[in-house]
Amino acid sequence: MVFSFPRNDREFVENVVFTFDKDGKISDVSFALARKSAEDIASHTNWPEEARIILMNFLESYKTAYALKRLDYISSIFDEDALIITGRVLKPAGKVNEFGAGKYVSFTRQSKSEYIKRLSNVFRSQEFINIQFTDCDVTKLGKAPGLYGIKLRQEYFSSSYSDTGYLFILVDLHNPDTPVIHVRTWQEEPDKNFGIIGPYDF
């Protein structure tokens, strides 16, 4: 599907995934992961096929919820005590050189309620939001079923702002119908000492 916007010349192409229930009826529609991200998850052949499908479905639902501004869904998947760190690249007037000098990155730790309130404002003010995932690295945590740490390179686009950075999501998928995110962090680049924030940094 091709998406275009009357007040912006940006255009997005999304492959669509249909989920069917046991009666063969469509129960859900979402935007597909990029092929590389899907292949990264599928490469864990030592995991049950069902687990890999659940992970893909979760990430597809996650990116689709932001594109469709589904604040209700996003609110439902974050734990009430979730650790949420957001970031924003600030570019002052003037040219940013090839080494990135002249730009600054602001980080904010937020509670779930603060994050959802801010996201609500973003959704209202933006004509569109689109996120794309690449470089998907998934770790199964402990012996508890369904607990995963997911590292992703994220490209974020909206009508007035865009950036590229790295997400870490700690999510409980033991019940696929009600995923629970316990940690969500963002950083612009991997740290030179410890790389991308991961499950063992908490």
Descriptions of predicted regions:
Residues 24-68, 72, 76:
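Short, low-complexity N-terminal intrinsically disordered segments enriched in polar/charged residues
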Residues 63-67, 79, 83, 120-128:
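Sec-exported extracytoplasmic/periplasmic mature domains
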Residues 42-43, 56, 91-103:
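Acidic/histidine-rich, surface-exposed loop or edge segments in extracytoplasmic proteins
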Residues 1-31, 186, 191-193, 198-202:
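Amphipathic, hydrophobic N-terminal targeting peptides for secretion and organelle import
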Residues 23-35, 148-153, 176-189:
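Short, well-ordered strand-loop elements centered on a beta-strand within folded domains, enriched
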Residues 69-94:
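Short, well-ordered alpha-helical segments enriched in acidic and aromatic residues
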Residues 13-27, 163-180:
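A short, surface-exposed beta-strand/turn
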Residues 1-21, 97-163:
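Surface-exposed, charged secondary-structure patches
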